[in-house]
């Protein structure tokens, strides 16, 4: 117990006690919930939509599959999954209830409420039985988890044999010059956009810092394999600004 309370982790570029991170992340997303989808479009100039389509292309949802969409927030991945599958079911889990409320509103507007469950919960301690889901997705969320390896271990636990993990996350550009240009944009433009559109500079400063702190593609691939996933692979998107990681529970 003492060891856990003494452990630290990153909150952006700040080092904080592990037990504080979840609450601080929750505060960030409570603050940005109502503007989250708009800000995604503005920050990425709409490219996040292309990345999510690429995620669905690789995932190839099938009718009747059961999805667990972790850190699913407003349900963007779940809506895409269900439309591609034709019919199925998605459980959206997120630490932040206001994000889920935004998703519920959208589900009702799109007449998809019966296909979706909304659960407030922690990626490191999923409230589901072993071998429950066909697919586990986490999109732009795992970098906000206090201990990402534990989240991956939980993903493995709740997937059925033959189930698939798919992670979409910001990553690292392979070229130092391009990375410096991207950092220049990220640190100087995105927080200011957050202030202008969402009235929140600090939350978007954290989001930018959390992107920069996240492991590179090969390091994260090793974490996926360590959780037990087989045939683990990654694909770069937009030269490595983001990356997809896939693995199977065999």
From Swiss-Prot:
It comes from Ruegeria sp. (strain TM1040). Pathway: Quinol/quinone metabolism; menaquinone biosynthesis; menaquinol from 1,4-dihydroxy-2-naphthoate: step 2/2; Cofactor biosynthesis; ubiquinone biosynthesis. It catalyses: a 2-demethylmenaquinol + S-adenosyl-L-methionine = a menaquinol + S-adenosyl-L-homocysteine + H(+); a 2-methoxy-6-(all-trans-polyprenyl)benzene-1,4-diol + S-adenosyl-L-methionine = a 5-methoxy-2-methyl-3-(all-trans-polyprenyl)benzene-1,4-diol + S-adenosyl-L-homocysteine + H(+). Keywords: Menaquinone biosynthesis, Methyltransferase, S-adenosyl-L-methionine, Transferase, Ubiquinone biosynthesis. GO terms for biological process: aerobic respiration; menaquinone biosynthetic process; methylation. Methyltransferase required for the conversion of demethylmenaquinol (DMKH2) to menaquinol (MKH2) and the conversion of 2-polyprenyl-6-methoxy-1,4-benzoquinol (DDMQH2) to 2-polyprenyl-3-methyl-6-methoxy-1,4-benzoquinol (DMQH2). It comes from the Bacteria. Belongs to the class I-like SAM-binding methyltransferase superfamily. MenG/UbiE family. The keyword S-adenosyl-L-methionine applies. This is Ubiquinone/menaquinone biosynthesis C-methyltransferase UbiE. PANTHER family: 2-METHOXY-6-POLYPRENYL-1,4-BENZOQUINOL METHYLASE, MITOCHONDRIAL, METHYLTRANSFERASE. It is an enzyme of class 2 (transferase). SUPFAM superfamilies: S-adenosyl-L-methionine-dependent methyltransferases. Disulfide bonds: none annotated. Its EC number is 2.1.1.163, 2.1.1.201. S-adenosyl-L-methionine binds at residues 74, 94, 122-123, 139. It holds the Pfam family Ubie_methyltran. One of its GO terms (molecular function) is demethylmenaquinone methyltransferase activity. The lineage of its organism: Bacteria, Pseudomonadati, Pseudomonadota, Alphaproteobacteria, Rhodobacterales.
